[in-house]
A protein has these predicted regions:
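Membrane-anchoring alpha-helices and their flanking helix-loop junctions
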Residues: 1-83, 95-155
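Solvent-exposed interhelical
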Residues: 86
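Extended, alpha-helix-rich binding/interface surfaces that flank or overlap catalytic cores
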Residues: 91
């Protein structure tokens, strides 16, 4: 087991990145509205995309729980997961979060939210995922390097 002080040195919590982006999108939509799909369609699509995010992330979360490792990037990772959703992506929880973010943006009828997705991905890569990858390489060595070369970061 690893010391609890030994963890990825992320810059910003992933929830803060997604929440701030959604808030900025809603503010931009209020001040500089962009046309979007009708509200009823937006609600239906938004819920569908949001649920897809849960559907993608939930099996990964269950696998993490069964492996007794943490969801919290500020805690030590005890197990390298390479099966299930982690075979599809090294970051299935973050894919789920991104789909949740997109679903909320659609639900609230803000095209700005969708336009900000590349920014969210960029910030997640730089401030969260790269520090996590450095940490996982340090902790799991060749096993993580092999997983990293065989499995995409996103999809």
């Amino acid at each position: 087991m690893h010391k609890t002080s030994d963890h990825a040195q992320i810059v910003v919590n992933p929830f803060v990145i997604h929440g701030a982006a959604l808030l900025i999108a809603l503010l931009l939509q209020g001040f500089l509205p962009l046309p979007f799909v009708p509200a009823t369609l937006a609600r239906i699509l938004g819920v569908a995309v949001f649920l897809a995010g849960i559907g993608f992330a939930l099996p990964a979360a269950r696998l993490m729980r069964s492996a007794h490792t943490t969801f919290n990037p500020n805690r030590a990772t005890t197990t390298l997961l390479t099966t299930g959703r982690f075979h599809i992506s090294r970051n299935p929880i973050y894919i789920g979060m991104l789909l949740n973010y997109a679903g909320l943006a659609i639900f609230f009828g803000t095209l700005w939210g969708l336009l900000l997705i590349p920014v969210v991905i960029l910030l997640m890569n730089r401030w969260v995922i790269l520090p996590e990858e450095e940490y996982l390489t340090r902790v799991f060595g060749e096993a993580y390097t092999t997983h990293k070369s065989a499995t995409p970061r996103w999809v």
